[in-house]
């Protein structure tokens, strides 16, 4: 039975882009908050807290949020903490929100060594404190992706309001023995491979990405667009909307001839895909035997569908989530020479019992977190 949280309003974008067939690439990118992977954790939270929860965009004026009759605002979060983003504007708005607030899935972004803690902009520090001041008494009301992000909260004096739970998308599939299903699938022949595409400007991954593009070709696989705008435009074949420099970099990232734009355009037409509904995304993943790429949520949705996957953990946000949730991963240096169909399986380091035990542990902690915030749930 689905839970009823009549006292809850979600501050987030929708879980799906219903009018995706009618949108151009730029509008698709805007609809998913600049990364379609965001749909994974928004869908998870929506499913876990109940059907048809009222929803208000985070960017709405505080007066609009306050006009909703619910007493608790739940905010699905991404990797907001870091030098890359100043949350001053949102902190100013949240200071005027007259509700208890709960953040789910907050992450910090830094280099993959996760030793140095970022010096947050003052606006982001204020943002954290606005959440901390709107907790349910002493109960933690900020779920974070892992111990690294928790240390960032500690640096700014709000660690008592945080708890490390990974990402709610870990619990989309209700199967308590999901790990064994993934392990069994990993024993099957690898015929088709899906790759959640990296950002074409991530030069440190270009050598790996070239090999993944070749892997897609060799297995009649697919190259899934998640971010940025230009990749959705390429998926839509809106090449006249993509500047020449970006097209050049897109070609270099895949090892395609820089001057032969027709070759690049044909490749994207043949292999690119994009999905804007999470159940449809997971169902699509079942058409493939393996998934590998630098997008944690692209890999996560495959795993939730029972399809083996490997995340290329190239920064703190991906590494932290993989380590917290026992998601199979490699570092870029591990596959510096690239990946082929014949070597792919050798990089899949996965213990189904450890994975299932970690899911159970985090599910129990997640349930306690939700209960502490007065939220009913289905996990």
Q: What would you call each of these model-derived segments?
A:
Residues 1-379:
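Active-site anion-handling motifs in enzyme catalytic cores
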């Amino acid at each position: 039975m689905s839970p009823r949280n009549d006292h809850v309003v979600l501050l987030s974008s929708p879980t799906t882009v219903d009018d995706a067939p009618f949108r151009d690439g730029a509008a698709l990118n805007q609809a998913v908050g600049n990364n379609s992977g965001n749909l994974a954790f928004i869908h998870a939270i929506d499913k876990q807290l109940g059907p048809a929860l009222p929803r208000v965009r985070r960017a709405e004026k505080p007066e609009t949020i306050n006009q909703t009759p619910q007493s608790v605002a739940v905010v699905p979060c991404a990797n907001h903490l870091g030098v890359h983003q100043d949350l001053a504007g949102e902190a100013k708005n949240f200071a005027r929100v007259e509700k208890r607030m709960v953040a789910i899935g907050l992450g910090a972004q830094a280099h993959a060594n996760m030793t140095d803690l970022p010096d947050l902009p003052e606006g982001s520090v204020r943002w954290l404190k606005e959440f901390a001041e709107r907790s349910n008494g002493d109960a933690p009301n900020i779920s974070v992706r892992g111990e690294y992000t928790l240390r960032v909260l500690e640096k700014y004096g709000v660690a008592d309001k945080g708890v490390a739970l990974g990402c709610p998308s870990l619990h989309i599939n209700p199967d308590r023995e999901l790990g064994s299903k993934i392990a069994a699938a990993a024993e099957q022949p690898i015929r088709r491979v899906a790759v959640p595409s990296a950002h074409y400007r991530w030069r440190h991954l270009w050598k790996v990405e070239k090999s993944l593009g070749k892997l897609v070709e060799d297995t009649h696989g697919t190259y899934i667009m998640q971010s940025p705008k230009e990749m959705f435009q390429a998926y839509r074949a809106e090449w006249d909307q993509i500047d020449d420099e970006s097209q050049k970099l897109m070609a270099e990232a895949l090892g395609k001839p820089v001057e032969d734009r027709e070759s690049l355009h044909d490749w994207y037409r043949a292999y690119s895909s994009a999905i804007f509904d999470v159940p449809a995304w997971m169902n699509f993943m079942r058409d493939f035997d393996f998934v590998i790429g630098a997008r944690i949520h692209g890999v996560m949705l495959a795993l939730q569908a029972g399809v083996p996957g490997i995340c290329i953990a190239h920064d703190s946000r991906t590494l932290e989530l993989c380590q917290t949730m026992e998601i199979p991963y490699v570092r870029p240096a591990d596959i510096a020479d690239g990946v082929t169909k014949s070597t792919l399986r050798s990089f899949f380091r996965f213990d189904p019992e450890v994975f299932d035990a970690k899911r159970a542990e985090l599910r129990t902690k997640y349930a306690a977190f939700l209960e502490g915030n007065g939220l009913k749930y289905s996990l």
